[in-house]
Amino acid sequence: MQKHKPLIEKLFAKNYQLIDGTDEVFELDLALWEYEVLSKEELINRSAYLKLVDGVETIHFKTCNLQNLEEIHKNSSFRTKIFFLDGKYSTGYATHSLFPYRGKFHPQLIRALLNILEIKPGNIVLDPMAGSATVSVEANLLGIDSISVDLSPFCGLMGRVKTFALDLDFNTLQSIIKDSKELLEKLKKERVPDYFLTTKEDKKRGYYETVLLAYLDAMGFASRSSSSIDKLFPR
């Protein structure tokens, strides 16, 4: 009887290994497509689904493993925590988990599509229905310029924060939130503070918007937790 050879060994060369949990048919298809389109160096630097390329760990795999998701989501609901822990390599990395947004694409999928379309630094990606800015975050991580547009002001806020937060200065953020009581009082006012409305280039605006998004996330969670199903989802 002929010895059985696992599918992965049939598809990929020796010392190439997929990221744990890559088992859906569409994921295998995208991983193989990346493998066929990208060079070995590009696979190491850009691949969404490969863990090892000729024995070398990919940037995506190493980046995801740098995060302590248990600590990041220690105050999240059980469902949210499990969602991002299970999606460590697909949904829970970088700034994608800053605000839960239903209906968004898996970031890992978007990264693979950018690779398959051979979009590289120097190109510009346009996303006319940006939602939670998944495309812009992935483009940013790959060194690609992007333009995101959405009719929703909230999606605009979310997208700005998720891209800004990729390289924010932690000490500056800490200095803004150190007086949390005063900041919360400003956020709870009916009139939005001026620094959220200014159109001028203000370096601190991104930090204030980051705090605002965190506040809205916390308020939303508190509201959902203290309300009945009928109130949250009226028929």
Language model features: what each stretch is:
Residues 99, 128-129, 148:
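Alpha-helix N-cap/helix-initiation motif
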